[in-house]
Curated annotation (Swiss-Prot):
Binding annotation for NAD(+): 274-288
Source organism per UniProt: Janthinobacterium sp. (strain Marseille)
Lineage, top ranks: Bacteria, Pseudomonadati, Pseudomonadota, Betaproteobacteria, Burkholderiales
Designated name of the protein: tRNA uridine 5-carboxymethylaminomethyl modification enzyme MnmG
Keywords: Cytoplasm, FAD, Flavoprotein, NAD, tRNA processing
BP terms from Gene Ontology: tRNA methylation; tRNA wobble uridine modification
Keyword Flavoprotein found: yes
Residue numbers binding FAD: 13-18
């Protein structure tokens, strides 16, 4: 057999973005090559041993809805599961899991090795093959050339990466891995706009040296135990473990302050900007100087190791300060550090240089995903990787590209934010970033995206069957509740008060009763008639169906109102702008606005409206110019005042 060197799609990098990109492309039937500097680190969790959280869990569910691997791998590796914001509304509830690092890597690698159309090869990439304005392949560190019609680059923190511990630093992609210096230099040659960012990680602690008896235990949810994937189950979960909570104190803070003169962040050695929402412990005591204490979570790294991850003390301070600050906390007085914490600086490329498909604007066929685009977090990377893999595959199939809108998915919100606003610091997803979050819930990710995933070719038969069964069950139950009526004649007042909180004065459909804020699906199903017969139950047994039915009915008014709002803005939001248009010709626009529009070349009117400094008045002027300019898409538009609104 001849060794293959020609593929439809090449994916460079085997982290969370790269693995999802490669799997998505291969699921869609394209011959795909995944190049990684080390096959042993495919799917490695480089920082915290957890998946999900507010906003992040929503992204994982969306990746899962389209056939991705992160959620199901977490179900197979998760050693603690919790629903965050469980007492709040469904829009902001989020799943979070602690994962066994080894089991997670095994789950990801197993899927990669067993995925048809996917080849793995262990080699770092030093160069890209570019002809004119199109990428045609990649060159490895030993000069092996691979050719493809699309290349997805997911380099993580490896591009010219530099690790800092105190005032000492060295080149690395992460601890124990070499940096991608040649590839970084090559990308700079291609004139892609770039900058430097920074992230960090805490020291790891030997659990045998921790006194858990003086700490607060934090168990996972037990009733019910959450599941991440629509294809997952509680039976998949390995043994469950608790986390533990301790706190910093004044002594801790004094020790940190005493080391700031040797901090690479506070002495100007590090130039890259760090993540605002995952600050180092140095940043915390500086930014929140009035706070006496910070909560620290001791998270187990896995079932077969004593290593613990102290979430909340990411640091690049010198090792002697790291040791002292760890040992200043309750329960950690005799702690042994297994690995020092560090900060890492790396190159990223301005995501405003990308199309909404994550293809670069200047080089056809070259896609970027993950931290190279200025994001932070496994979940953000995985979602981008999946999208880039899908669009790389679609391009090689000569099919139309696909990107979800802001009202369709958190993935759509993230990509739109990145390509219109760019980043000044590592971008993290939150539910607050989404205007339509009531419609973008974890529980309906499959209802929003699985059908389109099936049409694209990245959702398999088994998952499609599960989805169809759920969708049909939800529709049947909604119809039953809307067509089943209860009257005062067959419902005793005492029973009505027990289930509904008060008697009923007329006939009601079960759907109307379930809309009441104090009535749950479970209690409604227990409703009995005067003769003891079931008036509502037994209902459906599947938790996912019950949850979907209850949310759809209880929030119907809000969801319908949001849908109408989306419809109102949809036309202008998705109105395609001519890519050859010269914005410098638009009279009335400020020079700054014209410059920004020329630089970013927005694909739609919605994207243009979200570019920093582009006002509603500027959008109205632009529309007037386009209507007068003979662009047929704009000729029949209503008055511009409606667009500005």
């Amino acid at each position: 057999m001849i060794f293959p060197t020609k593929f439809d799609v090449i994916v460079v990098g085997g982290g969370h973005a790269g693995t999802e990109a490669a799997l998505a492309s291969a699921r869609m039937g394209q011959s795909t090559l995944l190049l990684s500097h080390n096959i042993e680190t495919l799917g490695q969790m480089s920082c915290n041993p957890s998946i999900g959280g507010i906003g992040k869990g929503h992204l994982v569910k969306e990746v899962d809805a389209m056939g991705g691997a992160m959620a199901i791998a977490t179900d197979e590796a998760g050693i603690q599961f919790r629903i965050l914001n469980s007492s709040k509304g469904p829009a902001v509830r989020a799943t979070r899991a602690q994962a066994d690092r080894i089991l997670y890597k095994q789950a990801i690698r197993s899927r990669l090795e067993n995925q048809p159309n996917l080849w793995l090869f262990q080699q770092a990439v030093d160069d890209l093959l570019v002809e004119g304005d199109r990428v045609i392949g990649a060159v490895t560190q030993v000069g092996i050339k691979f050719y493809a019609r699309a290349v997805v680059l997911t380099a993580g923190t490896f591009l010219d990466g530099k690790i800092h511990v105190g005032l000492n630093n060295y080149s690395a992609g992460r601890a124990g891995d070499p940096p991608a210096i040649s590839l970084s230099a090559r990308l700079k040659e291609l004139k892609l706009p770039q900058g430097r960012l920074k992230t960090g990680t805490p020291p790891r602690i030997d659990g045998r040296s921790i006194d858990f008896s003086v700490m607060q235990e934090q168990p996972g949810d037990l009733d019910p135990i959450p599941v991440f994937s629509v294809m997952g189950s509680v039976a998949m979960h390995p043994k469950q473990m608790p986390c533990w909570i301790t706190h910093t104190n004044e002594k801790t803070h004094d020790l940190i302050r005493s080391g700031l003169d040797r901090s690479p962040m506070y002495t100007g050695v590090i130039e890259g900007v760090g993540p605002r929402y995952c600050p180092s412990i140095e940043d915390k005591i500086h930014r929140f100087a009035g706070k006496d204490s910070h909560q620290i979570f001791l998270e187990p790294e896995g079932l077969t190791t004593n290593e613990f991850y102290p979430n909340g003390i990411s640091t690049s301070l010198p090792f002697d300060i790291q040791l002292a600050l760890v040992q200043s906390m309750r329960g950690l007085e005799h702690a042994h550090i297994l690995r020092p914490g560090y900060a890492i600086e790396y190159d990223y490329f301005d995501p405003r240089g990308l199309k909404s498909t994550l293809e670069t604007k200047v080089i056809q066929g070259l896609f970027f995903a993950g931290q190279i685009n200025g994001t932070t977090g496994y979940e953000e990377a995985a979602a981008q990787g999946m999208l880039a893999g899908i669009n790389a595959a679609l391009q090689t199939q000569e099919r139309d590209a696909w990107t979800p809108r802001r009202d369709e998915a958190y993935l759509g919100v993230m990509v739109d934010d990145l390509i219109t606003k760019g980043v000044l610091e590592p971008y993290r997803m939150f539910t607050s970033r989404a205007e339509y979050r009531l419609s973008l819930r974890e529980d309906n990710a499959d209802m929003r995206l699985t059908e389109i995933g099936r049409q694209l070719g990245c959702v398999g038969d088994a998952q499609w069957a599960v989805f169809e069964t759920k969708r049909e069950a939800v529709a049947r139950e909604l119809e039953r509740l809307r067509s089943t009526w209860v009257s005062p004649r067959i419902l005793a007042e005492a029973e009505a008060e027990r289930v509904l909180g008060k008697g009923i004065e007329r006939e009601y459909a079960l759907a109307d009763l379930l809309r009441r804020p104090n009535v749950s699906y479970e209690t409604l199903m227990s409703l009995k008639g005067v003769d003891g017969q079931d008036l509502a139950g037994p209902g459906v047994a599947e938790d996912a169906v019950r949850e979907q039915v209850e949310i759809q009915l209880k929030y119907a008014g809000y969801i319908d109102r949001q849908a109408k709002e989306v419809e109102r803005h949809d036309y202008y939001e998705n109105l395609k702008l001519p890519q050859e248009f010269d914005y410098m010709e638009v009279k009335g626009l400020s020079f700054e606005v014209r410059q920004k529009l020329c630089k970013h070349k927005p694909e739609t009117l919605g994207q243009a409206s979200r570019i920093s400094g582009v006002t509603p008045a500027a959008i109205s002027l632009l529309l007037v110019h386009l209507k007068k300019g003979g662009f047929k898409e704009f000729a029949a538009l209503p008055p511009t005042s409606e667009a500005a609104a």
